[in-house]
């Protein structure tokens, strides 16, 4: 291979596939650009013509409401033509291969693919395959990466905490199966966060996770001590079927974020969640709806961040 | 046909012979080394100056994809690839469609291979019907049809009671059982070594204990049943250590490793390179180094190509969904030479692991270069360099992690039973 998977030969962003290995300067540029778009999203319905005449294909091989919708809104605010394809019920079930599907859509003059797939590496595969003028944005691939989610999380943290270099961040929950956690860890590391913690039972941590540069905790009482940012993860119900956990009740008791546990963190700590939330499983409603929660602003920032990514890609 | 091979560097790994001399073949056998036998007239002379003349390669794992998987490869394409790679004998595992679990299928395969008259094909029969791990196959019938051993390939038996009975039954008749040690539940549909790389890439992982626990079970069952076992494609440092200890105890155990695992690690997966989706998974650097040590100290007896041609479509999928395996028949020789150079192993020692040792494991007479031996030979130019590419590979499978790599060592002639089948 040898070719960088997401940068072009000038070192600019060609695709957005992962936050791993993404230079800090590009990361900050995306956040700064997103900052300039927040006005647009708040001013409502004012469109910017940056993607006028461009076709953005939402290629979702896995069901999603929130991510797909925010991408769609972001593309429309940039004046792009958006085509939504729910691949979970489309040609894939008729036996067409992933790359055949991509070829057919490329022939319809796609300029950008937003890809969500349940297999790690799906977005890389597509990015390697498409013509050089097409851009690919990974909207979540298997357990591997969800870079725009991580970027909107970074945007949120920057809004509330300013300096990344003075933060203690804890990521709590099912790290093993989480593309969000992986992308958050790489983004936080690149932006200079000195201490990243992961808190989970051993069954929900991938092997050698400490090699990603995180401190491992199995206990919320110790793990939440003096933390500035709490990033909760969604717990899938199928983890009970696969012997990762005994029950949601026991999980909530030890790893669910309650007001008591939140009190262990710094008093000005913020609570984040990528959604959709399982209230009473990984997070107590009192915390989710409480004053330290920034979960709803996260969703709103998601639009600006996705506008930023799309406009930067279209300009490169 | 009388063939006179002139001036080649003759290497017989079995005896350690390594000298430049002439070789005389007649009636399919080696009749003289050095001096021309009385009345020997050259029907054909091969000038082998600067080349190495060694026994033809014996590959313990080469999938030919027949019957049933002809869209991936055919006997024609793969046996042509074999002789182009200097491979004169190969064992083909039973993971065809249907699996080699009844005598008719084996006879058909043998018959087809005989008609093509290329490399010698030694089918390995399925240990259980349909490779399902429940009912035993008719091993005696399969043996009579031509199976040299019995195996589950990549479908390990989950029920240890069944495995014990299968080993007992095979041992009754003195049949060898070939097993790749992997616990099916611990492997849990994983596709990569459990470690930092799988963690970064978010790939379902297979822990080392999937190999060592299965290995410990097999070793205990060997003691229980008296079966002799050949371990296929070991992948880990800990597994190698278990094999070393078991051999010291005197268990009738042999072991091979795939040439891919001798060179590569999980880091080679890079950004989801599906050509590195192999079974067992490529493991860590420490595992690979331990495999090399095991190969050098004799813990691991042989290197196989683990040849698995896969069609382009089946590889053009996200990593976990892509079909596992790599084409290897034409790479076994140059990659073994590369390994020998990197580990400062002499040529006779290195070649032993792809000729003499695997021939002993298969229980066949080839794999040596001696007077009276069958003239299955590989004549190669050790200094000829070539780049692995779609066009260079004769195998129908172009899938290999080594695409684009420059390798040294190219087969010039391959002889089977004293007949030139390549060159």
UniProtKB/Swiss-Prot annotation, chain A:
Coiled coil: none annotated. Heterododecamer (2C3:3R2) of six catalytic PyrB chains organized as two trimers (C3), and six regulatory PyrI chains organized as three dimers (R2). L-aspartate binds at residues 94, 179, 234. Belongs to the aspartate/ornithine carbamoyltransferase superfamily. ATCase family. It holds the Pfam family OTCace_N. One of its GO terms (molecular function) is amino acid binding. InterPro entries: Asp/Orn_carbamoyltranf_P-bd (IPR006132), Asp/Orn_carbamoylTrfase (IPR006130), Asp/Orn_carbamoylTrfase_sf (IPR036901), Asp_carbamoyltransf (IPR002082), Asp_carbamoyltransf_Asp/Orn-bd (IPR006131). It catalyses: carbamoyl phosphate + L-aspartate = N-carbamoyl-L-aspartate + phosphate + H(+). Carbamoyl phosphate binds at residues 66-67, 116, 146, 149, 275-276. This is Aspartate carbamoyltransferase catalytic subunit. Pathway: Pyrimidine metabolism; UMP biosynthesis via de novo pathway; (S)-dihydroorotate from bicarbonate: step 2/3. GO terms for cellular component: cytosol. The keyword Transferase applies. One of its GO terms (biological process) is 'de novo' UMP biosynthetic process. It comes from Nitrosomonas europaea (strain ATCC 19718 / CIP 103999 / KCTC 2705 / NBRC 14298). Catalyzes the condensation of carbamoyl phosphate and aspartate to form carbamoyl aspartate and inorganic phosphate, the committed step in the de novo pyrimidine nucleotide biosynthesis pathway. Its EC number is 2.1.3.2. Keywords: Pyrimidine biosynthesis, Transferase.
């Amino acid at each position: 291979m040898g070719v960088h998977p997401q940068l072009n030969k000038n070192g600019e962003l060609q695709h957005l596939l992962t936050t791993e290995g993404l230079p800090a300067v590009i990361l900050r540029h995306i956040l700064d650009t997103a900052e300039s778009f927040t006005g647009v999203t708040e001013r409502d319905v004012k469109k910017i013509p940056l993607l006028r005449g461009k076709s953005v294909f939402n290629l979702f091989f896995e069901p999603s409401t929130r991510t797909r919708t925010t991408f769609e809104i972001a593309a429309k605010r940039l004046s792009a033509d958006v085509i939504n394809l729910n691949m979970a019920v489309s040609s894939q079930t008729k036996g067409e291969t992933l790359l055949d599907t991509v070829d057919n859509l490329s022939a319809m003059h796609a300029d950008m693919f937003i890809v969500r797939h349940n297999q790690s590496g799906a977005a890389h595969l597509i990015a390697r395959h498409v013509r050089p003028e097409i851009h690919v944005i990974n909207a979540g691939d298997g357990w591997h990466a969800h870079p725009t989610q991580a970027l909107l999380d970074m945007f949120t943290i920057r809004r509330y905490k300013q300096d990344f270099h003075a933060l203690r961040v804890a990521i709590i929950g099912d790290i093993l199966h989480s593309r969000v956690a992986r992308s958050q860890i790489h983004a936080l590391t690149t932006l200079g966060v000195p201490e990243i913690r992961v808190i989970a039972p051993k069954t929900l941590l991938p092997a050698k996770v400490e090699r990603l540069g995180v401190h491992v905790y199995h206990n919320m009482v110790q793990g939440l001590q003096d933390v500035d940012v709490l990033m909760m993860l969604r717990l899938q119900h199928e983890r009970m079927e696969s012997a990762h956990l005994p029950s949601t009740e026991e999980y909530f008791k030890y790893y669910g974020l309650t007001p008591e546990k939140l009190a262990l963190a710094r008093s000005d700590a913020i609570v984040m969640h990528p959604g959709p939330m399982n209230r009473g499983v990984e997070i107590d409603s009192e915390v989710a709806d409480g004053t330290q929660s920034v979960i709803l602003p996260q969703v709103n920032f998601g639009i600006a961040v996705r506008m930023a990514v799309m406009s930067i890609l279209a300009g490169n | 046909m009388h063939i006179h091979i002139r001036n080649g560097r003759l290497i017989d790994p079995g005896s350690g012979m390594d000298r430049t001399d002439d070789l005389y073949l007649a009636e399919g056998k080696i009749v003289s080394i050095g001096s021309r036998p009385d009345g020997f007239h050259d029907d054909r002379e091969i000038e082998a100056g600067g080349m190495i003349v060694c026994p033809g390669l014996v590959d313990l794992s080469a999938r030919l994809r027949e019957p049933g998987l002809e869209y991936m490869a055919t006997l024609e394409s793969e046996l042509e690839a074999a002789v182009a790679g200097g491979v004169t004998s190969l064992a083909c595992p039973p993971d065809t469609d249907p699996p080699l679990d009844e005598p008719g299928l084996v006879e058909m395969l043998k018959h087809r291979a005989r008609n093509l008259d290329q490399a010698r094909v030694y089918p390995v029969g399925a240990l259980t019907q349909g490779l399902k791990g429940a009912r035993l196959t008719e091993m005696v019938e399969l043996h009579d049809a031509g199976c040299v051993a019995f195996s589950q390939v990549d479908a390990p038996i989950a029920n240890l009671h069944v495995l014990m009975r299968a080993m007992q039954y095979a041992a009754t008749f003195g049949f060898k059982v070939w097993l790749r040690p992997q616990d099916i539940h611990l492997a849990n549909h994983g596709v990569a070594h459990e470690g930092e790389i799988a963690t970064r890439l978010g790939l379902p992982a297979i822990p080392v204990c999937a190999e060592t626990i299965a290995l410990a079970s097999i070793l205990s069952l060997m003691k229980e049943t008296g079966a002799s076992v050949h371990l296929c494609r070991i992948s880990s440092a800990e597994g190698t250590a278990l094999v070393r200890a078991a051999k010291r105890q005197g268990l009738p155990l042999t072991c091979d490793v795939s040439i891919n695992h001798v060179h590569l690690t999980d880091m080679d997966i890079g950004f989801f390179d599906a050509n590195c989706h192999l079974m067992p998974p490529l493991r860590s650097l420490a595992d690979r180094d331990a495999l090399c040590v095991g190969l050098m100290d004799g813990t691991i007896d042989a290197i196989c190509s683990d040849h698995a041609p896969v069609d382009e479509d089946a590889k053009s999928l996200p990593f976990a969904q892509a079909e596992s395996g790599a084409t290897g028949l034409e790479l076994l020789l140059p990659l073994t030479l590369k390994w020998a150079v990197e580990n400062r192993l002499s040529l006779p020692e290195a070649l032993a692991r792809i000729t003499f040792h695997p021939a002993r494991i298969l229980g066949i007479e080839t794999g040596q270069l001696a007077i009276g031996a069958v003239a299955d030979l590989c004549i190669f130019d050790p200094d000829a360099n070539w780049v692995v590419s779609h066009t260079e590979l004769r195998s129908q499978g172009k899938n290999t992690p080594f695409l684009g790599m420059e390798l040294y060592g190219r087969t010039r002639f391959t002889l089977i039973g004293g007949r030139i089948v390549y060159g």
